[in-house]
């Protein structure tokens, strides 16, 4: 069993409050979230990450967001599970960072997402690329774009 510090415990309660609201308003998000285990991860460099039946959160990042922003970031992460990207739909030859950014771009332009208050979530405007492509096409576009950047400028 994972031992949480006070900040991690408080953030877990905030996340649970968001999810409880989904029970009445966003049944699909609630059901998908409920099929995963919520776990604190102190090492990762973002608010949320999913994989292997878990939704991980880093309290150092989640606490920077107000409740509405936290809800939007969590919604994006659950949408990744529903859409099976970036992990399950990863294509051969696609960079990891490009697939994560392509997931952001696709979700933000196709789902109703409010302000997340940070630069954690990338948009087509972030990279000055056209809108309207599917996830797989954005993976290719961003892999090509990132391969032209020096390592210090890569995402």
Kindly label every feature range from the protein language model.
Residues 1-72, 77-155:
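Short, functionally important secondary-structure microenvironments
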């Amino acid at each position: 069993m994972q031992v949480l510090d006070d900040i991690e415990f408080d953030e877990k309660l905030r996340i649970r409050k968001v999810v409880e609201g989904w029970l009445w308003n966003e049944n699909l998000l609630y059901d998908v979230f409920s099929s995963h285990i919520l776990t604190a991860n102190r090492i990762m460099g973002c608010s949320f990450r999913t994989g292997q039946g878990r939704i991980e959160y880093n309290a150092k990042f989640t606490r920077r967001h107000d409740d509405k922003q936290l809800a939007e970031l969590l919604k994006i992460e659950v949408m990744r599970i529903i859409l099976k990207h970036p992990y399950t739909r990863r294509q051969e030859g696609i960079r990891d960072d490009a697939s994560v950014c392509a997931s952001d771009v696709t979700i933000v332009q196709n789902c109703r997402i409010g302000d997340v208050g940070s630069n954690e979530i990338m948009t087509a405007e972030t990279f000055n690329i056209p809108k309207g492509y599917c996830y797989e096409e954005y993976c290719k576009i961003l892999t090509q774009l990132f391969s032209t950047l020096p390592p210090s400028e890569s995402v």
